[in-house]
Amino acid sequence: MARGPGPLGRPRPDTVAMPKRGKRLKFRAHDACSGRVTVADYANSDPAVVRSGRVKKAVANAVQQEVKSLCGLEASQVPAEEALSGAGEPCDIIDSSDEMDAQEESIHERTVSRKKKSKRHKEELDGAGGEEYPMDIWLLLASYIRPEDIVNFSLICKNAWTVTCTAAFWTRLYRRHYTLDASLPLRLRPESMEKLRCLRACVIRSLYHMYEPFAARISKNPAIPESTPSTLKNSKCLLFWCRKIVGNRQEPMWEFNFKFKKQSPRLKSKCTGGLQPPVQYEDVHTNPDQDCCLLQVTTLNFIFIPIVMGMIFTLFTINVSTDMRHHRVRLVFQDSPVHGGRKLRSEQGVQVILDPVHSVRLFDWWHPQYPFSLRA
């Protein structure tokens, strides 16, 4: 009599032997790579079956190596702890700390090697330095530079900047824009431009007479500025004079002129050193009126002005006059500069009030109406 399947019979070939009670599930690296996936590999697995929420390092490393090999990348490029985040059960296999140490050493060696290559590449680039062209090439190119592009041209390299310091550069620039019908002061005429002293300043002044883009800039200045000029703060008053203007009006007007020396940009930025022109071209770059400007205020009446020469100009306001038809100008002078946005009291310093005012104009040293010495 044949026996049926039962506890006394042999197990069928297609049945799988169940693990004994009390045995834990074991995970091996080759099992993870072969595509076998169990419930313990998922984050939402049953806590009764999987007691730990941490994936074993060996399993993570094995899966990471398998994925990277499929993607054509090296497994050491990504930390193993960030590769997987799932739940796993503690197992009895050997600790993978040695593998992690070896992996970290490999990453460190690759990082050091990469830094050395980057440093070597940077040294090669620094050592190359590009091509250095002779000064004659830059002087030839400078003949095609517009006056408003001189600054950009000088910033290309040191040789280009040196070319803009030469007397030949400024002489050629003057001849290129000079016309016979140009109305120029005596100091800016061709026979006076043979002097090397103040050559650069004289050429710049002449361009505001001859070069149309520069002349158009100064022709747009209104009689009364739209906003109060703020560039004169902490400027030193070098000179003051007034003169009587006789025009079409029945009563003459009075013109009050204040010559100021602006605070040097180097002092504002606390930078004492800067790029200086070559010694042989110092006369070309000499300019007694450098950083100077002229404040010209025209009034309808004569107004007594106290002595302010040598004092520091600290406050400048333009308001509407009391008759609501003209403007009122208030100037405040101090013995020392005012820094840090400190406010002044009304009784401090010397105040100059001009009212009624017909026009207020501010001329830089290159402006055609700026008075400069013929000896410059």
From Swiss-Prot:
InterPro entries: F-box-like_dom_sf, TMEM183. It is found in: Membrane. It is a single-pass membrane protein. Residues 1-20, 100-127 are annotated as: Disordered. Keywords: Membrane, Transmembrane, Transmembrane helix. The chain crosses the membrane at residues 300-320. The keyword Iron-sulfur does not apply. SUPFAM superfamilies: F-box domain. The keyword Transmembrane applies. GO terms for cellular component: membrane; SCF ubiquitin ligase complex. PANTHER family: TRANSMEMBRANE PROTEIN 183A-RELATED. Belongs to the TMEM183 family. This is Transmembrane protein 183A. The gene is TMEM183A.
